[in-house]
């Protein structure tokens, strides 16, 4: 995959997300290597948990932790690692871990990909149980890994998510 050819934004309202970890596939953490374009197994998580959403990043962005901006893509199906999915941001999960601040943009597929998410405009439109599952996952997925921890500090709205995306684009350029 030539990541250089994939833009951060498909248009003003849509972001391109490169999927690293499919939802509900088991306790495996994959990482996309930006230089080679390969997906590597980063580690086998010690908890028996799987990601509640497809997990990836926005190319050509840089968050405060030095990595590309992270995104959780709410979907009905797992998406293959390395796939690019066009999404709309609806909010952000605010958290910190042993390395510092680590926000996760929450996004849904665009109408062209799945019309069943058209009614979700903001974070409050998501099912409350899904939000609880996301928080539970991130509060516990590192529990059995020595020296690792996560603290979820709350949720922010779509405007904050878009601000973090734009800051990430600016920081990377």
UniProtKB/Swiss-Prot annotation:
UniProt-annotated binding residues for substrate: 29, 43, 55, 141
Localization of this protein: Cytoplasm
Alphabetically ordered keywords of this record: Cytoplasm, Hydrolase, Magnesium, Metal-binding
Catalytic reaction list: diphosphate + H2O = 2 phosphate + H(+)
Cofactor(s) this protein cannot do without: Mg(2+)
Residues the entry annotates as binding Mg(2+) 2: 70
One GO MF term attached to the UniProt entry: inorganic diphosphate phosphatase activity
CDD domains xrefs: pyrophosphatase
GO CC terms in record: cytoplasm
Binding residues annotated for Mg(2+) 1, in chain numbering: 65, 70, 102
Presence of the UniProt keyword Metal-binding in the record: yes
GO biological process: phosphate-containing compound metabolic process
E.C. number(s) listed in UniProt: 3.6.1.1
Top class in the EC scheme: hydrolase
Keyword Cell division carried by entry: no
SUPFAM superfamilies attached to this UniProt entry: Inorganic pyrophosphatase (SSF50324)
Classification via PROSITE patterns: PPASE
Known function: Catalyzes the hydrolysis of inorganic pyrophosphate (PPi) forming two phosphate ions.
Complex and partners: Homohexamer.
Record family assignment: Belongs to the PPase family.
Protein name: Inorganic pyrophosphatase
Organism expressing this protein natively: Rickettsia felis (strain ATCC VR-1525 / URRWXCal2) (Rickettsia azadi)
Gene that produces this protein: ppa
